């Protein structure tokens, strides 16, 4: 994943998915938050390492320039890059529950954590309020 420097006149607002959800991006103010592309290297993405992958990062940058930003755009500086492990399960539905009094979990986002985290958070808050 990465987030760019502010991009003047960023033309979109919202959360978007591409390639069956393997790519996801959204604006954060006038910055671009982009992640995914793990389907481009399944073998090496099955890891617990938190290191970024050069192949995935390059694939994301290429996607940004070819598919998201207008043709001829100056490439924005990437301000921060990171990666993480994904919680997968046989059922593609998050687990949202109270484990014991005042201990809640929201896990197994099946690779869609960035995209669905706001909705999951709302459900956890609702569960906490009873």
State each model region's role.
Residues 70-130:
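C-terminal catalytic lobe of FAD-dependent flavoproteins
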Residues 8-9, 46-83:
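Flavin-binding catalytic cores
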Residues 37-47:
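Amphipathic alpha-helix from the class-I
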Residues 6, 27, 36, 82, ...:
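Active-site proximal loops enriched in glycine and acidic residues that flank catalytic Cys/His/Asp
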Residues 11, 24, 41-43, 88, ...:
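Flexible loop/turn segments at secondary-structure boundaries
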Residues 7-9, 39-40, 101, 110-112:
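Short, glycine-/Ser/Thr-/acidic-enriched flexible segments
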Residues 1-32:
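Flavin-dependent oxidoreductases
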């Amino acid at each position: 994943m990465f987030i760019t420097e502010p991009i003047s006149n960023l033309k979109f607002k919202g959360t978007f998915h591409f390639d069956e959800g393997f790519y996801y991006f959204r604006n954060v103010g006038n910055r671009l938050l982009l992640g995914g592309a793990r389907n481009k290297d399944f073998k090496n993405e099955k890891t617990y390492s938190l290191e970024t992958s050069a192949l995935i990062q390059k694939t994301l940058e290429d996607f940004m320039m070819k598919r998201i930003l207008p043709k001829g755009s100056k490439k924005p500086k990437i301000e921060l890059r990171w990666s993480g492990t994904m919680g997968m399960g046989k059922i593609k539905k998050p687990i949202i529950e109270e484990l014991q009094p005042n201990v809640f979990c929201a896990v197994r986002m099946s690779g869609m954590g960035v995209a669905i985290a706001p909705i999951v958070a709302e459900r956890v808050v609702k569960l906490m309020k009873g």
